[in-house]
Amino acid sequence: MKYGYFDNDNREYVITRPDVPAPWTNYLGTEKFCTVISHNAGGYSFYHSPEYNRVTKFRPNFTQDRPGHYIYLRDDETGDFWSVSWQPVAKNLDDAHYEVRHGLSYSKFRCDYNGIVATKTLFVPKGEDAQVWDVEIENTSDQPRTISAFGYVEFSFSHIASDNQNHQMSLYSAGTEYNNGVLEYDLYYNTDDFLGFYYLTATFDADSYDGQRDAFLGMYRDEANPIAVANGRCSNSAQTCYNHCGALHKQFVLQPGEKVRFAVILGVGKGNGEKLRAKYQDLSQVDAAFAGIKQHWDERCAKFQVRSPNQGLDTMINAWTLYQAETCVVWSRFASFIEVGGRTGLGYRDTAQDAISVPHTNPAMTRKRLVDLLRGQVKAGYGLHLFDPDWFDPEKADVKPSKSPTVVPTPSDEDKIHGIKDTCSDDHLWIVPTILNFVKETGDLSFIDEVIPYADGGDATVYQHMMAALDFSAEYVGQTGICKGLRADWNDCLNLGGGESAMVSFLHFWALEAFLELARHRQDAAAIDKYQAMANGVREACETHLWDDNGGWYIRGLTKDGDKIGTFEQQEGKVHLESNTLAVLSGAVSQQRGEKAMDAVYEYLFSPYGLHLNAPSFATPNDDIGFVTRVYQGVKENGAIFSHPNPWAWVAEAKLGRGDRAMEFYDSLNPYNQNDIIETRVAEPYSYVQFIMGRDHQDHGRANHPWLTGTSGWAYYATTNFILGVRTGFDTLTVDPCIPAAWSGFEVTREWRGATYHISVQNPNGVSKGVQSILVNGEAVDAINAQPAGSENQVTVILG
């Protein structure tokens, strides 16, 4: 079943049926003010943190997808009313036509009902601490119409704990008042003039307003039938205490063919409402602000554009996968319809992997995240698994979060910096290849010598931080020389305790190879000697202890008693995705063993919806293996199609030179290819998800937890760097693709260090991998050297 389509010319996904089986969401805001909004205008807004500074209310996992950011319309002659988004009023779809266009950092809603066509475009202007609703109402009938418009949001009590508990305090700690066209919400306990005030205003002079939620909705009613809309007028409620909203009402008389346009502004900060109301009275300022959002993404998307025989790949890489990856870098894992704000902060491994994907489009945020992570590393070398970067930012360390009437304990230094017992064995290693990728992209080698403090005191250069990470993993190994699993590795549910993780040893090797590339560029002989010897030892340990001869693949690890996990003889958890893909991706293993391992991945783990994390799934609890054995079969870490490591398999197959297999893996997970089977997928077809139900679950193929997943960054990085093969070096650009043999070629436009490269890859011999010749601006070359900033360069690569 199909609910919409991709409009590639406008970089929009168009929803033509609003009754999709789950909320399909989008992100508005690229800086501090953010709105997570659904195709029915449900969702919530926050400033910087959805834990401390929630602007509007959200009730997760409700079937109604409410509350939200709503425009109601009422025919004042008949009393009939509806909403510009299908929800919350939900007019019969035989009578009303709705369309939603989710774009990059904006969403457009359109409703055509009973001779009135209305549109509402929501976005967050760059540089503003506010959200703008651009609303237009047109009378398409042949009669004059009197239409009332109501803008509505429900305000939050700011802190997630105040919103969801201890109402005996929060209900009596805020108030609203209406002055000069602005309905201002005062969090009275918060003395901060910025974070202590939210507002809703509009460019019209309101005929009526409400600041009390229950006055607007009415008792025993909800957002579907507010009493104020039913009556055609708000009650001008504004006072202290109880639940609060922002509701503004204006009546318009429209002649046949006449339009009216206005803006509604939702924002943060005392007095800011009047300023922005005055600014956006000139609707050309609304147009300019929206054009700024479009330009923002035009510039980012232009950094890498591909035209290939695979339309789904082009659609996702040219817009949606990059957009999702940037969203994860900015908003981490703390704001979605699943992660609803109770965990503000950065996951170490998540952020380090997110940042590998976007140094070309967002170098400033990539650099910031790297600094955040290095500040969150301790002298011993490991990273703090989950931390608030403000804790270690000297400019923000003394800034307190929004005050709350609910007692929320302030974490002590001991709470912030955990010990080995709570350390995940993989976290710190991801940052090493990400730093290398950043330096290659930007050419900013000075970053490597920048001095950054450790979380537990002292400081070191970035180069020394990288070595500390490598040294920690070299120290914490078992008797076999394989890295200890510690609390967990990348798989949080694989709790090996005193056991050993194959995945982490392969990751250690990959990080070592990345560091050695940097050390060689710096001609650091001492570091080269030390870490080359370390890498050789890791490779030997992996090949000696992790290969399963009977199965022909790499095991997942060993328990604390030395029992192997993931062998041919085992009936549960026989083959695992992480260890086998990273074995090849890292470069630690031979071509022969790599091919065998990936053949096992294909045989045991492949499905039409992507690669399973392990198979067969665990049915018998075993605490020596971990909590993964107590997860339902086919769900999440126990035999689901866990999306994040799927791109590792794409890289592995590309490194093996098997382009057809790499593309088969890519296509199976690509949400674009599931656009016509939403009855199975359920989730958005423009977003990668955390996991898809595995074959051992009755909902096999159902996608869960969209948007905030490391899948997006890895999908982008794997596709652009290894399938399409366009990779940056310290001084050169490499084009070394691995594609399906049937492809005749493809084209890429790549911006790098201010120069533009128009790359044409031609495949006259029908191969998957292997570069026969390279031309740069018509001249045969052995390598593509960095060209002058501002130059346009034609690159032709012949495969053979």
Swiss-Prot record:
Active site, renumbered: 492
Residues where N-acetyl-alpha-D-glucosamine 1-phosphate binds: 333, 343, 349-350, 490, 492, 637, 644, 690, 709-710
Residues given in the record as N-acetyl-D-glucosamine binding sites: 492, 636-637
GO biological-process terms attached to the record: carbohydrate metabolic process
E.C. number: 2.4.1.280
Transmembrane annotation, as ranges: none
Gene3D superfamilies found in the cross-reference section: 1.50.10.10, Glycoside hydrolase, family 65, N-terminal domain (2.70.98.40), Maltose phosphorylase, domain 3 (2.60.420.10)
pH influence on activity: Optimum pH is 6.5-7.0.
Alphabetically ordered keywords of this record: Carbohydrate metabolism, Glycosyltransferase, Transferase
Reactions listed under catalytic activity: N,N'-diacetylchitobiose + phosphate = N-acetyl-alpha-D-glucosamine 1-phosphate + N-acetyl-D-glucosamine
Pfam families: Glyco_hydro_36, Glyco_transf_36
GO molecular function annotations of the record: carbohydrate binding; glycosyltransferase activity
Temperature effects on activity: Optimum temperature is 20-37 degrees Celsius.
InterPro entries listed in its UniProt record: 6-hairpin_glycosidase_sf, 6hp_glycosidase-like_sf, Carb-bd_put_dom, Gal_mutarotase_sf_dom, GH36_catalytic, GH94_Enzymes, GH94N_ChBP, Glyco_hydro_65_N_sf
CDD domains xrefs: GH94N_ChBP_like
Family the UniProt entry places it in: Belongs to the glycosyl hydrolase 94 family.
Subunit record text: Homodimer.
Functional summary from the UniProt entry: Catalyzes the reversible phosphorolysis of chitobiose (N,N'-diacetylchitobiose or (GlcNAc)(2)) into N-acetyl-alpha-D-glucosamine 1-phosphate (GlcNAc-1-P) and N-acetyl-D-glucosamine (GlcNAc) with inversion of the anomeric configuration.
Name of the protein this chain belongs to: N,N'-diacetylchitobiose phosphorylase
The organism of origin for this protein: Vibrio furnissii
